[in-house]
Amino acid sequence: MESFTNDRLQLPRNMIENSMFEEEPDVVDLAKEPCLHPLEPDEVEYEPRGSRLLVRGLGEHEMDEDEEDYESSAKLLGMSFMNRSSGLRNSAAGYRQSPDGTCSLPSARTLVICVFVIVVAVSVIMVIYLLPRCTFTKEGCHKTNQSAELIQPVATNGKVFPWAQIRLPTAIIPLCYELSLHPNLTSMTFRGSVTISLQALQDTRDIILHSTGHNISRVTFMSAVSSQEKQVEILEYPYHEQIAVVAPEPLLTGHNYTLKIEYSANISNSYYGFYGITYTDKSNEKKYFAATQFEPLAARSAFPCFDEPAFKATFIIKITRNEHHTALSNMPKKSSVPAEEGLIQDEFSESVKMSTYLVAFIVGEMRNLSQDVNGTLVSVYAVPEKIGQVHHALDTTIKLLEFYQTYFEIQYPLKKLDLVAIPDFEAGAMENWGLLTFREETLLYDNATSSVADRKLVTKIIAHELAHQWFGNLVTMQWWNDLWLNEGFATFMEYFSVEKIFKELNSYEDFLDARFKTMRKDSLNSSHPISSSVQSSEQIEEMFDSLSYFKGASLLLMLKSYLSEDVFRHAVILYLHNHSYAAIQSDDLWDSFNEVTDKTLDVKKMMKTWTLQKGFPLVTVQRKGTELLLQQERFFLRMQPESQPSDTSHLWHIPISYVTDGRNYSEYRSVSLLDKKSDVINLTEQVQWVKVNSNMTGYYIVHYAHDDWTALINQLKRNPYVLSDKDRANLINNIFELAGLGKVPLRMAFDLIDYLKNETHTAPITEALFQTNLIYNLLEKLGHMDLSSRLVARVHKLLQNQIQQQTWTDEGTPSMRELRSALLEFACAHSLENCTTMATNLFDSWMASNGTQSLPTDVMVTVFKVGARTEKGWLFLFSMYSSMGSEAEKNKILEALASSEDVHKLYWLMKSSLDGDIIRTQKLSLIIRTVGRHFPGHLLAWDFVKENWNKLVHKFHLGSYTIQSIVAGSTHLFSTKTHLSEVQAFFENQSEATLKLRCVQEALEVIQLNIQWMVRNLKTLSQWL
């Protein structure tokens, strides 16, 4: 699945960071002055969102700390008998000692009862504490829950629920689902029935599976030896979204059974599960559409199922629809037959064996363009008025599909492959087997309005989702702790395949950019290993972050570079062949590599140092004669030096590559493995400089001794092209990151980028703009306007020649066009080089033509932003927004509207997107991030997030990538203790699950680091800048 943001880079899908220490780029933050007076208890009762006291349904009564813990335990276990009312406490007051009375002696009966109660209570406590503890692995707890023998959760009907764990038991597995659905897109409800063929792997009496939000009307059970259906009762345990069927007979190992469940449910109004969409077509007619998004845990909301990735099965799906609608699912349509009331029922062929999260179905009005590719019918679908924008996607898909089949030496196994542009979709895209779903802006391409960046976005996301047909669909991780096996591989293949097939797009620049941003996130204490233990739904949702995607991909790039492309490819082919249609763990991947390397290198041992611990190494390099002295430690952004964790536990096996001035760069590269704290590399000759981590293929930062930094800086000034553009960008990134850590003077970082006046490549310039923009944003948001202006003037002086050479056209290579876009946006944002005048002239001509005059696509967003600075321009852009047929153009308009200096307009934009009527709610994250990037809105976004937190969580789900992005984007530019206290207080007032979210902890850490950066650098920066 592709998380989505359509910013400059893609951290799960294009994110641009604007804070000093936040990886999710485009986000924004805004906050009002915090409340200076603590709330009285009476005031808490009237909080708009409600406090945790009121959530527990206690009304005006408060509860002390022990009682709140007790109530939490009751909720956790689902035990109604543990609930206590305040009335019990009040009645107890009568037994308290009166101040002026004597203590009456209790009766013998009373003493016996009291002693008995105490003995029972102590016994229960001892049993609970003496029970064997479960040892959790990263896959979760596999020990039998012995405490369940004494304390069991309670189902909704008051009976004991026979299973207490979040993970399903493995005694029963599904073999095949027959699913029939009849959605009503007007009432937004649906009826369904699912028949599940089961097999018992162990003797049991209970069938435990997932179900949530279903009104179950009938459940029947049948064994393989009997054709008689038996109606059975179900138990529901909503807290774990589970149901239990108690079979009428023992289920015996190796025997097959059939379970049929009939139910009804609402079509979701969120972006999760089987959800509904309404939109207005060109004729202003309201249209209805329904689609699915099941990853990670939402298949259970559409039909009862074993909703864990390891429970693979086949699926036969039937959908009843209106005659004017089209229904699609994973497999080709097998038949269409008339149903009741003039409806039609489509039946789809039985699927291959797959996980529940990959099941998909869509109902709505669509048109398609198709082409056969070696027996597979490839089709791209869109709503009727946008069918003209699917040609690029179809051509791209055909080329990539052929490439993957050749590279993996495994044919795509299905007879059809559909790609569908969904009118309203939260994720960037989803890899459902045979039915890929996309946002319209990530699949559709309009030649007249789509920029080169839009083309790259569409191409890369198609490449990503197609790669999933092998990595994730054919071979699937057993549990969400190893999500990186899906997403890391798909992300790596996304860049690798585009570089192979569409070399002119220079996708390596985007991959480099993404690695830089991911490492910023991974350098925080709130980071996590890419293979991490997860259990709760919030923990699983949070695994869909830039680390699973881009760190996973970066580690694979590093491994490929170290082993060679041929060895890497052979290991991947072996891995796919050995585990087709299976569910695997990380060790299965590394075993395939070890088999190919013939154990000359223990790849498993090497790579576990990268996947099972968070963070990455800082490699310190010192050159002494012909020796390179190397040392490794964790690169850790910390609030104070003493807060850094002990370094003794951090050790990576690091592929060390380097280049020097002693050999021809294009022909010489040396690689060795640093698998201990320090080591020495012997050079073959005396050299003037050495650059470690050649082409930045390694996932680490390099720090040089002062003289070696100086030698590299001097070489860049003499002739930067001795080093590749990747290496030049890498040096810029590393020195600014080290300056942020205090290991290098900030002035030395600016000395290094002085060479930029001679730079012509995109990657180094965009990285320098990014790093200096981080500093500018902090200075501006704190009101240091003179200092921020001096910073802009210095950067402008370095890039003045390049800016003056730009034309307002779409001419040049894709890389040149992206550089033009970045330079002109920088110039216009700061009113440099007559940029505003040129953009205003273009905008006025476009507005005079009522939007019919074409604009250069690569500078379109810059022109729109300048135009939106006036009241007339803003209103005209807004009037054009709804009528635009291109999502690429609509996004450019939206970004311009959200860049206004009018806070009333900004608030209205965010509110309109949240409501979803004029601007779709899927755009809200983009709007919030854009609002917060600019000075007038940087406090407004945080206020909006606070005021609408409950609505946001309902729409996007706690822990989801969108929530991560919104939290980061509305806080990551704060750099005062006042804002730190406000953000912390707000989240402490939410649920415990919210406070524990990794994105919340990360937001607090980022604010602290911003504060630290300003304390460390502001004075010296003002002295020499």
Swiss-Prot record:
It is a single-pass type II membrane protein. Its cofactor is Zn(2+). The chain crosses the membrane at residues 110-131. Residues 1-109 are cytoplasmic. The modification N-acetylmethionine is found at residue 1. Residues 132-1025 are extracellular. The modification Phosphoserine is found at residues 80, 91. Substrate binds at residues 295, 428-432. This is Leucyl-cystinyl aminopeptidase.
